[in-house]
Amino acid sequence: MAKKTVEALGAADLKGKRALVRVDFNVPLDESGQITDDTRIRAALPTIGMLTGGGARVILVSHLGRPKGFDDQLRLTPVAKRLGELLGQTVYKADDVIGPEVEEAVKKLEDGDVLLLENVRFYPEEEKNNPEFAQKLAGLAELYVNDAFGTAHRAHASTEGVARYLRPAVAGLLLQKELEYLGKALESPERPVLAIMGGAKVSDKIQLIQNMLTKVDSILIGGAMAYTFLKAQGVDVGASRCETSTTKKDGTTVDLLQLALDLLAEAKERGVTFLLPVDHRTNDKFGDLADPPVTPDANIPEGQMALDIGPKTEELYVAEVQKSGTVIWNGPMGVFELPGFSKGTFAVAHALAESDNLSIVGGGDSASAAEKAGVVDKLSHVSTGGGASLEFLEGKTLPGVAALDEA
């Protein structure tokens, strides 16, 4: 799925042209409205710099949070200020997304200028992918760049609808990097390929596991989702969090214990190594312990809840990482936010950092864990989109990517 990128545009495509750029500036704010982590703003700098350097007039569009209509707390004013500091130039800020005032602000732009529109989700038309709203957005510019991988799995007006009315429509540098790394891991990886899956709910990762079984040589399971697989095989899970069924959107119930057995059987049939924890670190309640007890085997005693993989499992999983050519990591091995139960997740993170394989970390919790372990700069690629990377790895088409011009 090769898409045309911003790098493919020539000087004539950029100089003096108005470029509408969808970025992901959905950054965390504290109670006083200060940005607590500007990673997502920094991630967009290469694309913005390339466009302004080429003389384009850049119009940025992003969402922030989940507003219900206009909400002063979720205006993009602090983002414009921080972006200006990072770019070393004034970033103009519009008080709206569409309308006469915005059109006036766009008219005033000179080559190399940057204008940030207000939070696009102030308009319910954005998430409804309303064609008129998309058309009004498209009317502001002469070319469209999508650099927001984090929302590429959403068919919204600013991510998908706008590309119907504005050409060229190309991928920004960040989106291009995401597609290259994730695409390589799925289509032409260095073997053997290992998928590390973790997190609390197996129901969130069913499609991911199903798709991975057709792509990888081995799978490691950690986190609370491992207890579903263990319980399905008759292992005692004590008081651990263990999902046994889930309800689909159509109201039907899925027996997750049976599904776990089916997935294990499919792995065996396909010759995929499927590893589960052989020991655990536990507590008698959900909370931290400086030196948690370790189970002698996979069984978890009554009244105890497993909150992390144990040292034997760590060794097993680290060895698997070391012999793999490509590793896709999606989800922590335990409750890594609690220091006493962070060892399993951090052991995996450090093993990835120290090996010379292609290591790809799906966004969300795994990205936070990699950051907390201090290994982000030693990994091949840490995705900026949790939901988007998950859907891409599940084999789904991302609407925000499908809408762009073919290379």
Curated annotation (Swiss-Prot):
Residues that, per the record, bind substrate: D24, F25, N26, R40, H63, L64, G65, R66, R121, R154
Pathway where this protein functions: Carbohydrate degradation; glycolysis; pyruvate from D-glyceraldehyde 3-phosphate: step 2/5
GO terms (BP aspect): gluconeogenesis; glycolytic process
Keywords, sorted A to Z: ATP-binding, Cytoplasm, Glycolysis, Kinase, Nucleotide-binding, Transferase
Listed GO MF terms: ADP binding; ATP binding; phosphoglycerate kinase activity
Coiled-coil ranges (or none): none
Binding site for ATP: K205, E337, G363, G364, D365, S366
Subcellular localization: Cytoplasm
InterPro entries: Phosphoglycerate_kinase, Phosphoglycerate_kinase_N, Phosphoglycerate_kinase_sf
Top EC class of this enzyme: transferase
Record field: catalytic activity: (2R)-3-phosphoglycerate + ATP = (2R)-3-phospho-glyceroyl phosphate + ADP
Record GO cellular component, one term: cytosol
Subunit structure, as described in the record: Monomer.
Family per similarity comment: Belongs to the phosphoglycerate kinase family.
Protein name per Swiss-Prot or TrEMBL: Phosphoglycerate kinase
Species annotation: Gloeobacter violaceus (strain ATCC 29082 / PCC 7421)
